[in-house]
């Protein structure tokens, strides 16, 4: 089901006390408001249960930022999809560019994580995107197609329909280069065409595709006005209610 979504990704930020204050502040800011999008916050594992218990989860969905590629057992330090689901979180961010780059997550590992997330009733927010060298070599379409196919194309149409995609132009994050709304629309439209070729138009048209490249209060309206951009996966701006709310209200 295609929806407008604004999802925050806190990354490795906030202590539990700080995270609870941030979540409660957002909950308060949304009281009495009916935004034209679903709102999700991705928090560290340590915060999930406390945050889910402290806010109105009908108004704000809670996401983990990762999960293990194993079901359970002797994997010290790992957190399984079942554990995430037991906290009250309903979503899990998978395949983020930082996980791919720093923790060497491969399409095969991510495929397993997606399957475990779905098996435990979690909605994956699956990230894709190319780095600067790939963009400059004109390989951006090829790269995102391979990322999608390598981790998701063994799913049935029914299961694929449960996935949220998030496109991150890795080349535009922290490089001083920015992706224009037109560039975002171009690749989102390409992604939707790739999905249509595999699963048909109905599945493609129903897929939510978020934009994850330095989206902020200044550019959110222009980005979200594009027909194939269904919202944003927000990093730094999600760590302050006064920066996150204008993005939510950009719809």
UniProtKB/Swiss-Prot annotation:
Keywords, in A-Z order: Cytoplasm, Gluconeogenesis, Glycolysis, Isomerase
GO terms for cellular component: cytosol
GO BP terms: gluconeogenesis; glyceraldehyde-3-phosphate biosynthetic process; glycerol catabolic process; glycolytic process
Enzyme class (EC, first level): isomerase
Gene3D superfamilies found in the cross-reference section: Aldolase class I
Pfam family, one: TIM
Localization per Swiss-Prot or TrEMBL: Cytoplasm
Keyword Oxidoreductase: no
Listed SUPFAM superfamilies: Triosephosphate isomerase (TIM) (SSF51351)
Segment forming the signal sequence: none
Positions of substrate binding: 9-11, 174, 214, 235-236
Classification via InterPro entries: Aldolase_TIM, TIM_sf, TrioseP_Isoase_bac/euk, Triosephosphate_isomerase, Triosephosphate_isomerase_AS
Catalytic activity, EC: 5.3.1.1
Active site positions: 96, 168
GO molecular-function terms, A-Z: triose-phosphate isomerase activity
Disulphide linkage map: none
Family: Belongs to the triosephosphate isomerase family.
Function: Involved in the gluconeogenesis. Catalyzes stereospecifically the conversion of dihydroxyacetone phosphate (DHAP) to D-glyceraldehyde-3-phosphate (G3P).
Subunit structure, as described in the record: Homodimer.
Record-given protein name: Triosephosphate isomerase
Native source organism of the sequence: Parabacteroides distasonis (strain ATCC 8503 / DSM 20701 / CIP 104284 / JCM 5825 / NCTC 11152)
């Amino acid at each position: 089901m295609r929806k407008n979504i604004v999802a925050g990704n806190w990354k490795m930020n906030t202590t539990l006390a700080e995270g609870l204050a941030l979540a409660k502040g957002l909950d308060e800011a949304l009281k009495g408001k009916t935004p034209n999008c679903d709102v999700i916050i991705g928090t560290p594992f340590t915060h999930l249960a406390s945050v889910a218990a402290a806010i109105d989860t009908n108004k704000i969905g809670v996401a983990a930022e990762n999960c293990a590629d194993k079901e359970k057992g002797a994997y010290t330090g790992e957190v399984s999809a079942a554990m995430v689901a037991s906290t009250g979180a309903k979503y899990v961010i998978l395949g983020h560019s930082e996980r791919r780059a720093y923790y060497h997550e491969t399409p095969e590992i991510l495929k397993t994580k997606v399957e475990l997330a779905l098996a435990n009733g979690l909605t994956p927010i699956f990230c894709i995107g190319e780095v600067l060298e790939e963009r400059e070599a004109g390989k951006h379409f090829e790269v995102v197609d391979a990322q999608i196919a390598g981790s998701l194309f063994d799913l049935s149409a029914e299961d694929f329909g449960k996935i949220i995609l998030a496109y991150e132009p890795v080349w535009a994050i922290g490089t001083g280069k920015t992706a224009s709304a037109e560039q975002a629309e171009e690749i989102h439209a390409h992604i939707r065409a790739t999905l249509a070729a595999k699963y048909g138009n109905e599945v493609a048209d129903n897929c939510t595709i978020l934009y994850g490249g330095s989206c902020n209060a200044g550019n959110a309206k222009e980005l979200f006005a594009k027909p194939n951009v269904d919202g944003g996966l927000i990093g730094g701006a999600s760590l302050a209610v006064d920066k996150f709310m204008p993005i939510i209200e950009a719809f």
